[in-house]
């Protein structure tokens, strides 16, 4: 299924130069209305939203996660041609859905996420190459006040940076190295309005701040991997390359989905026994079997 909204040559160049690509108005208001209404009606999604803490028990944010996709709004959005084809062009090979998250920073909550690389965690999953990226879609305004993303522009060119602890996906970067990174790379705040999109490389160093605003900051984060880069380590069946039926760009606006949050299996990211637990937390190094 080909997209009618292909990335331009200039956009592709910008992504590889900077490590990210802003896409204003990537989703229309009517496309987002169903998921926004569902979250307003049931903010905890039936109690399935979990909370992430850092090592000091400072609350970060609330989230849902999924690795498989159904035919509800969440599952269809995951498979939209404009996202999947864009990811494939930027990665340089066909892609599959790795995992996705709804990330919410409640109003007024301390919810910062420290500087990190996503591929630092995905490498622990067993992905040998950084041929991975995330597509972010804003559901509410993301500003400096509400805790928007920050990118170190061009930092993906460093390659994978060693982590100084291995207990979760946001393990710290060595502080001395981080000082050098902040001196070398421009710190860019990524302000987003509802519907704006963002592709960013698995190796770009990024963070987000506390939400000091009077509303919840909510983002959808769809992550994709090259089909030839599936994890080689054990206990990663949920991250294996899976067939994905790509849907037309107008699927959401045409209402071609069955419910909003329903048939897409949501992972219990607070339960270490759940297959999708490693979307966020990794207990040291994964099983080498």
For each predicted feature, which ranges?
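Double-stranded beta-helix
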Residues: 13, 142-205, 209
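Generic beta-strand structural signal
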Residues: 93-100, 111-113, 131-137, 147, ...
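Short edge-strand/loop segments of extracellular domains
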Residues: 105-106, 152-159, 223-229
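Active-site glycine-rich loop that binds ribose-phosphate moieties when present
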Residues: 114-123, 137, 176, 183
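A short beta-loop-beta micro-motif enriched in histidine and acidic residues
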Residues: 83, 121-132, 185-186, 192, ...
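Short, conserved beta-strand element in jelly-roll/cupin
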Residues: 116, 125-144, 191-194, 223-227
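Non-heme Fe(II)/2-oxoglutarate
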Residues: 45, 49, 55, 197, ...
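Non-heme Fe(II)-dependent double-stranded beta-helix
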Residues: 1-18, 23-126, 164, 235, ...
């Amino acid at each position: 299924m080909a997209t009618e909204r292909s990335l331009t040559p200039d956009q592709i160049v910008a992504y590889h130069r900077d490590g990210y690509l802003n896409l204003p108005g990537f989703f229309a208001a009517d496309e987002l209305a169903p998921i926004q209404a569902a979250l307003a009606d049931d903010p905890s999604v039936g109690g399935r939203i979990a909370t992430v803490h850092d090592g000091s028990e400072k609350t970060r944010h609330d989230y849902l996660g999924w690795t498989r996709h159904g035919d509800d709004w969440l599952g269809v959005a995951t498979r939209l041609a404009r996202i999947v084809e864009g990811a494939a062009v930027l990665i340089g090979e066909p892609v599959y859905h790795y995992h996705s998250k709804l990330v919410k920073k409640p109003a007024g909550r301390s919810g910062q996420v420290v500087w990190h690389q996503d591929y630092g965690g995905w490498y622990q999953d067993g992905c040998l190459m950084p041929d991975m990226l995330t597509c972010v879609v804003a559901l509410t305004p993301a500003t400096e006040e509400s805790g928007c993303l920050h990118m170190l522009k061009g930092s993906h060119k460093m390659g994978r940076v060693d982590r100084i602890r291995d207990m979760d996906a946001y393990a710290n970067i060595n502080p001395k190295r981080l000082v050098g990174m902040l001196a070398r790379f421009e710190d860019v705040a990524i302000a987003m309005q509802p519907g704006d999109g963002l592709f960013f490389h698995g190796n770009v160093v990024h963070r987000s701040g506390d939400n000091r605003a009077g509303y919840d900051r909510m983002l959808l984060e769809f992550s994709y991997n090259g089909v030839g880069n599936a994890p080689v380590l054990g206990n990663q069946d949920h991250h294996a390359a899976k067939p994905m039926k790509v849907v037309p760009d107008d699927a959401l606006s045409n209402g071609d989905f069955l419910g909003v949050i329903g048939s897409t299996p949501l992972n219990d990211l607070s339960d270490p026994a759940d297959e999708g637990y490693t979307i966020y937390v990794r207990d040291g190094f994964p099983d080498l079997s």
